[in-house]
Amino acid sequence: MVIAVDFDGTLFEESYPEVGAPKWDIINYCKRRKEMGDTLILWTCRARKRLKMAIRACKEVGLDFDYINNHTKESLKRYGRARRGCKILADVYIDDKAINPKELENDIFQNG
């Protein structure tokens, strides 16, 4: 399984442009999934110096990613080279700003 994980507010508390405190539940979940053989992608809007800060913070808590803001080799082989800024192809997206469409449907049906 390919899992794309956001940084700010997801792996670490929201503190942009700095790095917030680690969110250990999510970090440990990602570590377990990697140990199980899953592919992890760090998927963040951070760039340049701020991206390096995020990568360093992840390494300091023992979290290594297979890809950083990039598609897997299998995705590139199957779909070709993606343009910069394209959505990363993953089976699961973990992001503090995300909403599950099923939950949204339930809310719409219940609350109009």
Segments from the language model and where they lie:
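HAD-like aspartate-dependent phosphatase fold
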Residues: 1-112
